[in-house]
Amino acid sequence: DCDVAVLFIETSGRLPMCGHGTIGTVTIAVENGLVRPREPGRLSLDTPAGRVDASFRQEGRFVEEVRLTNVPSYLHAEGLAARVDGLGEVVVDVAYGGNFYAIVEPQRAFRDMADHSAADLVTLGRRLRDALNAAHDFVHPERPGIG
């Protein structure tokens, strides 16, 4: 039912959805004639997370703009705690929007992003992800293969 199917593979593995990857896929596929959209200016993609619809604006041969309508998002969990080396206990909410995302509000263990370098944020983010995954199962309620 879609114009194209796509898998997102990166250094950490396979992703159910990737916004940047979708924009790049639409751009490359349209500009190089790899796919012919059923409807001008629109492309539907079958992703592991579900159907993603893209609209694009083309000037001549080049795609100048891509807009996405992603899979439905929702709040998956509230108030999950995880112990993170270098921070202590961090409390997060977890949202889903094609992937699971930890939402970290300012708190005792983590007051502000400005308190950390970009490299530290990457390290702490990985530690937080690992701690959350060790303590909790994140599985999509309608697509159990996503987790």
Residue locations for each model-derived region?
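Active-site proximal loop and beta-alpha junction motif in alpha/beta enzyme cores
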Residues: 1-17, 22-147
